[in-house]
Amino acid sequence: MDVGELLEDVLRIYSPSHGEADLAKYLLEYLKRFVPDVWIDEAGNVIAVKGSGGPVVWLHAHMDTVPGPLPVKREGGVVWGRGAVDDKGPLVAYLKAFLDSNPRGTLVLALVTAEEDDSAGTEALLRGGPPRPDYVFVGEPTNLHIAYAYRGGAKVYIELESRGGHASSPIYDNIVEELFAVYQEVKRALGHAERYDAFTVTPTIIQCGEAPNKVPTKCVMVLDVRIPPGKSCRDLAQALPPKARAGPCTEPVEVSPTNPAARALTRALLKLGVEPKLSRKWGTADFNLLVSLTKNIAAFGPGDPALAHSEDERIDIAQVELAAKALKLAVEELGIIPRRL
């Protein structure tokens, strides 16, 4: 398969969260050319299986991207487009590794929906579907680092209302000012700091005002809050001031950096002449959910995470190919390791 060509093709299919159907159909037809056991499940996930028996290894990546299409272009060995880094570059690497691998057990490719939103695709996999995994590799842009920890996360909402009034009159309370006061209160309550081991609070959406000469009657601010190790969703909820509320929350997770999946990747990279590097991720991903299936898990993939969700998403095709080679070696090594029951 031509990795660069496939990457360009999937980038041209815009697939924001809950809008992955066209991409899923494309990937289904593509995979059918190589493996017979492939389908789209009730959550819109594309699932492919090869081999049989144990151990069972999952290659997991997500089809969706953040909103906002970008033009797709290729210059030399670099491809630009929405999702080039997060997560279509890793997805293509995982797809290639799946097709190239000769597993001694069962190999599952799970290309899921809505990771950037409510993780509906992975939630469906947790309820059932393909054979349960002994080992999981999660496709995320790690720049070929092996990630073993992710922070938790939740959206926090500040929603204020007032009677409004004429902008020329100072007698009215202005909820714009109150909105920012509550935001600062949230930061103080959580001990916001730009460190991995601290809560981080980032405003992402502000909706406020109806006219330039009118005191607003409603203001909404959405905060992206990340939860550090050692803290929990409960800690977040208990710390929030009365005028802020948390939405659905994901707990932080950490597994052993020497678990079999991580070790298999370490050895694979060494065989390829790449220095293995471990990392803890500042974000939140389906990794946080998949640890409920197995602690033998690692996140890994091509792409610079600093470019994820940006207007300059781009990825080096050679790194996608290198990631696929490392995954293939790791999958085949795990096939000769006795399962941990």
From Swiss-Prot:
Stated EC number for the protein is 3.5.1.130, 3.5.1.132
In this chain, Zn(2+) 2 is annotated as bound at 86, 116, 309
Q: What does this protein do?
A: Catalyzes the release of L-lysine from [LysW]-gamma-L-lysine and the release of L-ornithine from [LysW]-L-ornithine.
Q: Quote the subcellular location field of this record.
A: Cytoplasm
Q: Which InterPro entries match?
A: Bact_exopeptidase_dim_dom, LysK, Peptidase_M20, Peptidase_M20_dimer, Peptidase_M20A
**Name the record gives this protein:** Putative [LysW]-lysine/[LysW]-ornithine hydrolase
Q: State the disulfide connectivity.
A: none
Instruction: Specify the domain of life of the species encoding this protein.
Output: Archaea
Which keywords fit this entry according to its UniProt record? Amino-acid biosynthesis, Arginine biosynthesis, Cobalt, Cytoplasm, Hydrolase, Lysine biosynthesis, Metal-binding, Zinc
Cofactor note (record): Binds 2 Zn(2+) or Co(2+) ions per subunit.
Annotated Pfam families: M20_dimer (PF07687), Peptidase_M20 (PF01546)
Q: Does the keyword Thylakoid apply?
A: no
Which reaction does this enzyme catalyse, per its entry? [amino-group carrier protein]-C-terminal-gamma-(L-lysyl)-L-glutamate + H2O = [amino-group carrier protein]-C-terminal-L-glutamate + L-lysine; [amino-group carrier protein]-C-terminal-gamma-(L-ornithyl)-L-glutamate + H2O = [amino-group carrier protein]-C-terminal-L-glutamate + L-ornithine
Required cofactors, per record?
Zn(2+); Co(2+)
Q: Which residues form the signal peptide?
A: none
One GO term of the biological process aspect: arginine biosynthetic process via ornithine
Keyword Zinc on entry: yes
- What species is this protein from? Pyrobaculum aerophilum (strain ATCC 51768 / DSM 7523 / JCM 9630 / CIP 104966 / NBRC 100827 / IM2)
